[in-house]
Design a protein with these regions (language model features):
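Generic detector of solvent-exposed, compositionally biased contiguous segments
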Residues: 1, 5-7, 27-32, 103-117
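N-terminal low-complexity, intrinsically disordered segments
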Residues: 1-24
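Signature of extracytoplasmic/envelope-associated structural regions
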Residues: 8-9, 44-50, 80-84, 139-141
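Solvent-exposed loop and beta-edge segments used for protein-protein assembly and interaction
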Residues: 13-15, 51-53, 128-132
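Aromatic- and glycine-enriched beta-alpha-beta binding-site module
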Residues: 22-65
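Short, conserved charged micro-motifs
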Residues: 29-33, 69-72, 145-153
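Aromatic/basic-lined ligand-recognition segments
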Residues: 57-137
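Mixed-charge, glycine-accented linear interaction segment located at domain edges/termini
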Residues: 108-173
């Protein structure tokens, strides 16, 4: 199900096991306010999902935060506190990419820094966790969707991916 708030241009997509929130045309100075708004939306909608596998905030914006800007990613995600009504693990991922970046690369490498509270609301202190997730998507433009999950397509980039994982994990705290 796709819900569109035309006034604020927020798109909420309810999937079988995930809630996606997309904010198009983001002003860099308003990100913290948008994160707070997304947090409220996710908390309000979390009861819909019996077994949520993840919550994703997707920013479609005029700027991009690249993999090497970890401090900026940490600043964006440090205050995320989304607690679902389920004991299932919930993952909050923040992805910031301009359409130009996604369309201009054969492989879209995105660092997701996650700091979400997971689990039942009464157990907030026991369910905190912090994680660094590095994802690699084959270009997700419409013309290339059939290759998105084919491992063979990623093979030419395998060494770069491994190096990226080790480098990012060494600096994550």
């Amino acid at each position: 199900m796709r819900i569109i708030n035309s006034k604020e241009q927020i798109v909420i997509i309810l999937r079988p096991s995930r809630i996606d929130i997309e904010f198009p045309r983001i002003n860099k100075n308003l990100i913290n306010k948008l994160l707070e708004k997304a947090q409220v939306i996710l908390s309000d909608l979390s009861w819909i999902l019996e077994h949520p596998l993840g919550n994703r905030i997707a920013f479609r914006s005029d700027f991009c935060i690249f993999d090497d800007e970890l401090n900026a990613m940490r600043a964006l995600s440090k205050n995320l506190n989304v607690v679902t009504n389920s004991n299932e693990t919930t993952e909050m991922s923040i992805r910031l990419n301009t359409p130009e970046v996604i369309q201009g690369e054969p492989v879209n490498i995105v660092t997701n820094i996650n700091n979400a509270i997971i689990g039942v609301k009464k157990d907030q202190e026991e369910t905190k966790r912090k994680s660094s997730l590095i994802t690699y998507d084959v270009n997700t433009v419409v013309t290339n969707t059939e290759n998105r999950f084919e491992f063979e397509t990623l093979l030419p980039y395998y060494e770069e991916m491994i190096n990226n994982v080790f480098e990012r994990s060494e600096h994550f705290n």
